[in-house]
Regions:
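Non-catalytic signal-transmission and effector/linker regions of two-component phosphorelay proteins
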Residues: 1-5
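Conserved acidic carboxylate
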Residues: 8
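Charged phosphotransfer/docking patches of two-component systems
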Residues: 11-15, 91
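A generic structural motif
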Residues: 25-34, 79
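CheY-like receiver
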Residues: 45, 51-126
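C-terminal output/effector regions of signal-responsive regulators
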Residues: 132-135
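Charged docking surfaces used in two-component/phosphorelay signaling
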Residues: 15-23
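Helix N-cap/capping motif at the beta->alpha junctions
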Residues: 36-42, 65
Length: 135
């Protein structure tokens, strides 16, 4: 099961991501548990490292997605971060906060599923390494 946070202020965009996650889970025979946050402050307040993946909009009211990602990295270095934006010029800045990738709005399912496959592979690789480390 994947635990996913969607930090997105546009209800339509958040709904699209949620429906794509449902479709992805059905196609791959897995489960995606997603939680939507309408702004970055709500997401970061009381944050606990319980998410495997975060989809983060860059243009958010109040605290923008780039600054939210910087603050997220202060408390959780390992969560996988994918930016969702209509501003492709921010893609390079995403690497400053160790983002795995970015998705340009409007989001289409095929590129979304490829990026999610990449995130899942990274999670699986991380879990395998954790299993191999002797205690």
């Amino acid at each position: 099961m994947l635990n996913i946070a969607i930090v997105e202020d546009d209800p339509q965009a958040a709904g699209t991501l949620t429906s794509y996650l449902d479709r992805y889970a059905q196609e791959r025979g897995t489960t995606c548990n997603s939680v939507i946050f309408n702004d970055a402050v709500d997401f970061l307040t009381g944050y606990k490292a319980s998410f495997d993946l975060v989809f983060m909009d860059i243009e958010l009211p109040g605290l923008d997605g780039m600054e939210a990602a910087r603050r997220l990295r202060e408390v959780d270095r390992s969560v996988i971060l994918i930016f969702v934006t209509n501003m492709a010029n921010f893609a390079v800045k995403g690497y400053e906060v160790d983002a795995l990738d970015f998705i340009v709005k409007p989001v289409a399912y095929f590129p979304f599923s490829i990026k999610l496959d990449r995130a899942v592979k990274r999670l699986e690789s991380r879990q395998e390494r954790e299993l191999l480390v002797p205690v």
